[in-house]
């Protein structure tokens, strides 16, 4: 363990001051690494300034992703994880159990002062439970966001994690209010902004064309990007067929680029869904996908994270969901909830093509400096570590 020196306070959260503050950072899937990359960069920056803080990067292995090669980590400019717990596969319950068992051994072998979790994947919840059972502080990045839809596994993960966390890092005033209503103390809540946007802004100049961009003769703002993966949209054959019919028939013949999720690809094959201007492509890397989004006319999606990126890039976003845990993308940004009824797609696309889509703005503190604020809170800039 780190050597004890004295006690200090981080805005109401009491920690012990150590020669080295040790943080364990948890990631379970590719989007988690995209979110923790700027946090690692912020830690490295303060280390270079002489601050005594160390981190250990733990990959639970929750999601196997063929795009997570060595190149992926090089692109994000972060090191490979210190350990991969190898907890992929199985049902949600089995995966939760595997992660908890493996992370308990990891944390007992490598104790720390704080476990930092991000987002709402199963690893976020499972590692938070283990940390608290081992009397270790938990900080949750993207705390307080809620869809209020308990049919979403992610919503359950958020609720459990926020019930256990000691420090909450939030993306919006709505998240702050949610946490206060759920009993969090004001001094535990730190409105810092959105780490996903830190990564987005840091990589603007690195975005690169996918290999197919020129061969398909894509032109700026003259194609649509489509992503679908949620059960509500892809698990019912008739509904999925209707959804694709409404999309393909109402985009004025523009190419539709669909980087397809493996579970969706299987359904498409079974149903034989196709259209002359529908191009189904393999999943893309972070830099290629965001190049595609940055230059498209609009995105049609059922994802949450993409709605944040389109808001900052000023790209119209049509979300095929009945709710969102990121309401600021609708109230401030370029996103609109279309719902899960396929018949609502045509009116939304008519609005887009008539030039009546809202311009949108960027939410407060989504400025590319969120990770720096997170580390400032954890270190407490008014105290110097020995």
Describe every region a protein language model picked out:
Residues 61-79:
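N-terminal beta-loop-helix "entrance" segment that forms/cooperates
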Residues 117-118, 129, 168, 292-330:
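A donor-sugar binding/catalytic signature common to diverse glycosyltransferases
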Residues 63-67, 86, 164-235, 338:
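A nucleotide-sugar donor-handling region in carbohydrate enzymes
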Residues 24-27, 32-50, 72, 84-185:
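Active-site and donor-binding regions of nucleotide-sugar-utilizing enzymes
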Residues 46-56, 251-256:
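A generic structural motif
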Residues 11-20:
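Short, Lys/Arg-enriched N-terminal segments with co-localized hydrophobic residues
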Residues 70, 208-295:
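Donor-nucleotide binding loops and adjacent catalytic segments primarily
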Residues 73, 174, 336-386:
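Leloir-type glycosyltransferase catalytic cores
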């Amino acid at each position: 363990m780190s050597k004890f020196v004295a006690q200090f306070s981080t805005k109401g959260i009491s920690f012990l001051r150590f020669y080295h503050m040790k943080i364990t950072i948890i990631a379970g899937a590719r989007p988690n690494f995209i979110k923790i990359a700027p946090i690692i960069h912020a830690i490295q920056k303060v280390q270079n300034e002489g601050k005594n803080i160390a981190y250990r990067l733990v990959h639970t292995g929750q999601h196997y992703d063929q795009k997570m090669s060595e190149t992926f980590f090089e692109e994000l400019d972060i090191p490979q994880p210190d350990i991969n717990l190898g907890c992929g596969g199985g049902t949600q319950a089995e995966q939760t159990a595997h992660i908890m068992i493996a992370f308990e051994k990891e944390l007992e072998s490598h104790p720390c002062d704080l476990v930092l979790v991000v987002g709402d994947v199963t690893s976020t919840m499972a590692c938070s439970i283990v940390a608290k059972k081992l009397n270790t502080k938990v900080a949750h990045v993207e705390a307080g966001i809620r869809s209020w839809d308990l049919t979403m596994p992610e919503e359950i993960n958020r609720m459990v994690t926020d019930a256990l966390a000691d420090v909450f890092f939030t993306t919006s005033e709505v998240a702050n209010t949610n946490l206060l209503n759920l009993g969090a103390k004001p001094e535990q809540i730190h409105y810092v902004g959105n780490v996903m946007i830190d990564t987005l802004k840091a990589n603007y100049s690195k975005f690169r064309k996918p290999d197919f961009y020129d061969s398909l003769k894509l032109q700026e703002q003259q194609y649509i990007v489509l992503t679908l993966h949620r059960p509500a949209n892809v698990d019912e054959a008739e509904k999925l067929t209707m959804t694709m019919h409404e999309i393909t028939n109402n985009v004025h013949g523009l190419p539709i680029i669909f980087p397809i999720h493996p579970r969706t690809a299987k359904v498409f094959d079974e149903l034989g869904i196709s259209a002359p201007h529908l191009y189904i492509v393999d999943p893309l890397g972070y830099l290629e996908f965001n190049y595609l989004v940055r230059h498209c006319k609009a995105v049609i999606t059922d994802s949450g994270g993409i709605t944040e990126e389109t808001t900052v890039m000023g790209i119209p976003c049509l979300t095929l969901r009945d709710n969102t845990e990121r309401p600021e993308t609708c109230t401030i940004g370029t996103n609109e909830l279309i719902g899960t009824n396929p018949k609502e797609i045509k009116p939304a696309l008519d609005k887009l093509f008539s030039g009546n889509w809202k311009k949108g703005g960027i939410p407060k503190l989504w400025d590319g400096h969120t990770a720096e604020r997170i580390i400032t809170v954890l270190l407490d800039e008014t105290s110097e570590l020995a």
